[in-house]
């Protein structure tokens, strides 16, 4: 696989070519994903739940994300690697710059930040300092205590309108990718069409430019339960490499996510 950059993702959006993304936390799986030509890998704070066994992502630290980013980069030199900014690691622009710098030095190509238009100034400051940003909207797991649990976002008209506004504001501030989690498919399609930057979805229907899954869900090895928006590709194929290839094919062909993986 050739080295992937944000320019490739922009080109694919313009061409209408969908792309697959998956979380990765270590060199071995990162290497497997690169060999199967997964273009984008996310070192997610989901590691707090799937690796550390916590009930949410809040305890994860910047140092832990940096460690796993180094591991993923070692295994996958050519993928575009996004690294999550953990809870409270970007409470101020100064904190954001310091912690984003650690993740970029660990091998990330981009950092991911959760939040709406209130993080626009932070996004702008990072972009001005050569740190590409993916802005995460919808169900933002770091806000689980505000939401009262892991709930679908953007179902009422006012919240849907605010999410569209958030996406456009963050794009204008310099965000180079928008990630939508657990939002109605119709809203995700609207945001995807409104934004000029690539939009990645998880539990957001199949109209987004890209899809992302937590690797443990894709392989059916999550400790607790399988989210509605996920699919066990390993059960279907019986082989990890074939499972990754099937996931990529289904995303590119627009057959995943199907109706049963989608919220309305």
From Swiss-Prot:
Pathway: Cofactor biosynthesis; (R)-pantothenate biosynthesis; (R)-pantoate from 3-methyl-2-oxobutanoate: step 1/2. Its main location: cytoplasm. GO terms for molecular function: 3-methyl-2-oxobutanoate hydroxymethyltransferase activity; magnesium ion binding. The active site is at residue 181. Mg(2+) binds at residues 45, 84, 114. It catalyses: 3-methyl-2-oxobutanoate + (6R)-5,10-methylene-5,6,7,8-tetrahydrofolate + H2O = 2-dehydropantoate + (6S)-5,6,7,8-tetrahydrofolate. Its cofactor is Mg(2+). 3-methyl-2-oxobutanoate binds at residues 45-46, 84, 112. GO terms for biological process: pantothenate biosynthetic process. Signal peptide: none annotated. It comes from the Bacteria. Binds 1 Mg(2+) ion per subunit. Homodecamer; pentamer of dimers. NCBIfam families: panB, PRK00311.1. This is 3-methyl-2-oxobutanoate hydroxymethyltransferase. It comes from Aliivibrio fischeri (strain MJ11). The gene is panB.
């Amino acid at each position: 696989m050739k080295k992937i950059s944000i320019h490739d993702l922009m080109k694919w959006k313009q061409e209408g070519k969908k792309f697959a993304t998956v979380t990765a936390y270590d060199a071995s799986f990162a290497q497997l994903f690169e060999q199967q030509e997964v273009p984008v890998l996310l070192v997610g704070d989901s590691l707090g739940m799937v690796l550390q066994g916590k009930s949410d992502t809040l305890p994860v630290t910047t140092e832990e994300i940096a460690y796993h980013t180094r591991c993923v980069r070692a295994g996958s030199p050519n993928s575009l690697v996004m690294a999550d900014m953990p809870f409270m690691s970007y409470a101020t622009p100064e904190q954001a710059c310091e912690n984003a710098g650690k993740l970029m030095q660990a091998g990330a190509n981009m950092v991911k930040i959760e939040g709406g238009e209130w993080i626009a100034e932070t996004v702008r400051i990072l972009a001005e300092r050569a740190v590409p940003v993916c802005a995460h909207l919808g169900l933002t797991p770091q806000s689980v205590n505000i939401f009262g649990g892991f709930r679908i976002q953007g179902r009422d008209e006012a919240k849907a309108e605010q999410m569209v506004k958030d996406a456009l504001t963050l794009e204008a501030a310099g965000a180079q990718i928008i990630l939508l989690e657990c939002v109605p498919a119709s809203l995700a399609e609207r945001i995807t069409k409104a934004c000029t930057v690539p939009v990645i979805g998880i539990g957001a229907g199949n109209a987004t430019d890209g899809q992302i899954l937590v690797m443990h869900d894709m392989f059916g090895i999550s400790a607790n339960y399988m989210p509605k928006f996920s699919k066990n590709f390993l059960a279907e194929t019986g082989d990890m490499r074939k499972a990754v290839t099937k996931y990529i094919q289904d995303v590119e062909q627009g057959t995943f996510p199907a109706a049963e993986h989608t919220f309305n």
